[in-house]
Amino acid sequence: MSFYVVIPARYASTRLPAKPLKDIAGKPMIQHVYERASQSQAKAVIIATDDARIQAVAQAFGAQVVMTSASHSSGTDRLQEVTRTLGLAADDIVVNVQGDEPLIPPAVINQVATNLAANTYASVATLSEPIHYLEDFHNPNIVKVVADKAGRALYFSRAPIPWPRDHFAKPDVNVLPDNFPAQRHIGIYSYRVALLDRFVTWPQATLESIESLEQLRVLANSEAIHVAEACAQVPGGVDTEADLQRVKALLEVGQ
């Protein structure tokens, strides 16, 4: 099995402008992501951007860069443009690694690609990890996922799912039940190129719009998403200045 990694990198960010170029331990953040992805078993790692500043920095450290349109409405549309530019085959597998994940373990990149190759019923694969704290369970910025016993995603939501009705019917309950199966969705995906080609022809789905979750467009069109628990802990990405300082501290101690 072979696969490609595409790292989308946008310069504009409301909370952290110029995020991909932020310095972390002497390197721009996008370089850390690229180096982590290059430690996976990917056939090639490509940075996709619509910004000449990111292109120049990435090419300076030796990355392959594909320039994309600035008008894409979603990251998946951008990914599809890259696969078209590269001339990838319909059955090729592409892993989308976010450009703000400088601590992404290479093992999970391999895992999500391998899982898609092994589960032929699925057009997309992704990962999750357990939720242990009630605060995280209720946090709408932490996306929850439920799946069937074969790992087929049933739903993704910002709402707290599954809801332990009887547990919370008790007075003064402020913890999750023991061995509770809540899972946090980790935003790494592998796709079959054919799925990307179909995705860009679909209108936005109602549930996708309500939840502001792009993956719900896939489920709304009766395509299967495989979900598995990540084989390694995936530290959070960088969305804010506080996140940036946290990642810097972790890299200083050799994370």
Curated annotation (Swiss-Prot):
Keywords: Cytoplasm, Lipopolysaccharide biosynthesis, Nucleotidyltransferase, Transferase. It catalyses: 3-deoxy-alpha-D-manno-oct-2-ulosonate + CTP = CMP-3-deoxy-beta-D-manno-octulosonate + diphosphate. Its main location: cytoplasm. GO terms for biological process: CMP-keto-3-deoxy-D-manno-octulosonic acid biosynthetic process; lipopolysaccharide biosynthetic process. SUPFAM superfamilies: Nucleotide-diphospho-sugar transferases. It is an enzyme of class 2 (transferase). GO terms for molecular function: 3-deoxy-manno-octulosonate cytidylyltransferase activity. Its EC number is 2.7.7.38. Pfam families: CTP_transf_3. Transmembrane segments: none annotated. Pathway: Nucleotide-sugar biosynthesis; CMP-3-deoxy-D-manno-octulosonate biosynthesis; CMP-3-deoxy-D-manno-octulosonate from 3-deoxy-D-manno-octulosonate and CTP: step 1/1; Bacterial outer membrane biogenesis; lipopolysaccharide biosynthesis. It comes from the Bacteria. The keyword Nucleotidyltransferase applies. It is found in: Cytoplasm. GO terms for cellular component: cytosol. Activates KDO (a required 8-carbon sugar) for incorporation into bacterial lipopolysaccharide in Gram-negative bacteria. Belongs to the KdsB family. HAMAP family: KdsB. This is 3-deoxy-manno-octulosonate cytidylyltransferase. It comes from Cellvibrio japonicus (strain Ueda107). The lineage of its organism: Bacteria, Pseudomonadati, Pseudomonadota, Gammaproteobacteria, Cellvibrionales.
